[in-house]
């Protein structure tokens, strides 16, 4: 039995979001659903298709029988309305203890110096990324550019380093999203886990069990 199902970076409203895979994962048996940031991407509902609304409907249904938590990401700044109608609890971060292990959840964008210090370039490249999506029906180019840009600015390593420096000594397991790079890194005093995203060809998520163990899964 999965105690906490952790997903992140679904980015509803974009064509690269792997929505069928999201629905498949949401059909697993779990007690708590924790969406670790960037469930949404665009608040123009004109860009939402039937599968986007189906996912939100699934979340709304789950919230009636499960704990459903949305930890805010940098694309979730105006998520209050949609979180309210879907029954999600909206938080900046989340901490819980399972079998004497302290788990800490935060999206990770706060530790991304690119967003913090270069907001205009962040806005520009995000716009370029979505423009390419319109013409790249296979999404291979847009995904490649996103992975390449993350590599150039070393976002995944910076996020991990700063995340661990701030929260590692107070918690046993740190869980982030944001970088779209699934990974597990073990340190002397904690473990850092990034759940990846649902915007790549191979999507990823994390299962946390009642004994405190966890797995990074791919679909």
Feature-to-residue mapping (PLM):
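Binuclear metal-dependent phosphoesterase catalytic core
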Residues: 96-99, 186-219
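Hydrophobic secondary-structure block in the mid-to-C-terminal portion of proteins
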Residues: 153-188, 196
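Active-site environment of divalent metal-dependent phosphoester hydrolases
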Residues: 12-15, 40-43, 72-81, 110-114, ...
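Hydrophobic/aromatic beta-strand patches that form the interior of the parallel beta-sheet core
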Residues: 5, 34, 69-71, 104, ...
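Core catalytic region of metal-dependent phosphoesterases/phosphodiesterases
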Residues: 7, 12-99
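Structural motif
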Residues: 3-4, 31-32, 101-103, 173, ...
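Active-site-proximal beta-strand elements of phosphoester/diester hydrolases
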Residues: 3-11, 102-109, 191-196
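Conserved catalytic scaffold of divalent metal-dependent phosphoesterases
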Residues: 65, 69-72, 76-170
């Amino acid at each position: 039995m999965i105690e906490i199902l952790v997903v992140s970076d679904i980015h509803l409203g974009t064509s690269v979001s792997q929505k069928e895979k999201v629905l498949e994962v949401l059909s697993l048996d779990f007690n708590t659903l924790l969406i670790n940031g960037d469930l949404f991407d665009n608040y123009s509902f004109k860009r939402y298709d039937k599968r986007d609304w189906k996912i939100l409907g699934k979340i709304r249904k789950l919230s009636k029988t499960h704990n459903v938590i949305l930890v805010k990401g940098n694309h979730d700044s105006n998520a209050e309305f949609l979180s309210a109608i879907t029954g999600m609890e909206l938080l900046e971060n989340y901490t819980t203890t399972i079998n004497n292990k302290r788990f800490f959840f935060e999206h990770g964008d706060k530790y991304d110096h690119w967003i913090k210090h270069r907001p205009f370039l962040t806005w520009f490249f995000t716009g370029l990324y979505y423009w390419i999506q319109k013409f790249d029906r296979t999404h291979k180019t847009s995904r490649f550019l996103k992975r390449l840009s993350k590599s150039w600015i070393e976002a995944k390593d910076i996020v991990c380093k700063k995340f661990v420096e701030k929260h590692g000594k107070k918690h046993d397991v740190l869980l982030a999203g944001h970088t779209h790079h699934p990974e597990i890194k073990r340190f002397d005093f904690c473990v850092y886990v990034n759940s990846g995203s649902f915007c790549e060809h191979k999507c990823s998520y994390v299962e946390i069990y009642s004994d405190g163990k966890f797995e990074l899964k791919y679909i």
